Amino acid sequence: MELDQDVNRIIKSKTATKVSAMQAEIEANHAYIYDVQLKKLLRLHDEELQERCHTPLRKLYAKYSSRAEGNRDLQTWAEHVERDLRLLETTLRLVREGKAQDTEQAPGKGDRIFRSD
């Protein structure tokens, strides 16, 4: 019972104690840290990030973006060349198959029209 009275007296006390003074100081420090130092830290971090990361990346993009556009043209050109090569390969295969069929058939007068012997 005596302990309860002491606790109630401490809790309901209007006078400042060392603990309440320490708590007030902690709360004031927290407010200062949050309102001033954290905002300052975020601003410094943003400036540092901008300076070390964003700006160099932007410069790299500006430097090499025109080359990347040229590579798109190169890709299109390579696709056309590949298509033409496939067309030539198919044509050669068909010509070889045609020659093989011509040699298997008995030579006749009609066959000589297309041959240049």
Curated annotation (Swiss-Prot):
Q: Keywords in alphabetical order, please.
A: Endosome, Transport
Q: Can you say where in the cell this protein is located?
A: Endosome
| Main location group | other
Task: Please provide, in alphabetical order, the Gene Ontology terms of the cellular component aspect for this entry.
Answer: BLOC-1 complex; endosome
Question: What is a biological process (GO) this protein takes part in?
Answer: endosome organization
Q: Cite the residue spans of the region called Disordered.
A: 97-117
Look up the domain of life of the source. Eukaryota
Does the keyword Membrane belong to this entry? no
* Entry function: Component of the biogenesis of lysosome-related organelles complex-1 (BLOC-1), a complex involved in endosomal cargo sorting.
Spell out the family assignment given in the record's similarity comment: Belongs to the BLOC1S1 family.
Q: How does it assemble?
A: Component of the biogenesis of lysosome-related organelles complex-1 (BLOC-1).
What is this protein's record name?
Biogenesis of lysosome-related organelles complex 1 subunit BLS1
Query: Where does this protein come from, organism-wise?
Result: Eremothecium gossypii (strain ATCC 10895 / CBS 109.51 / FGSC 9923 / NRRL Y-1056) (Yeast)
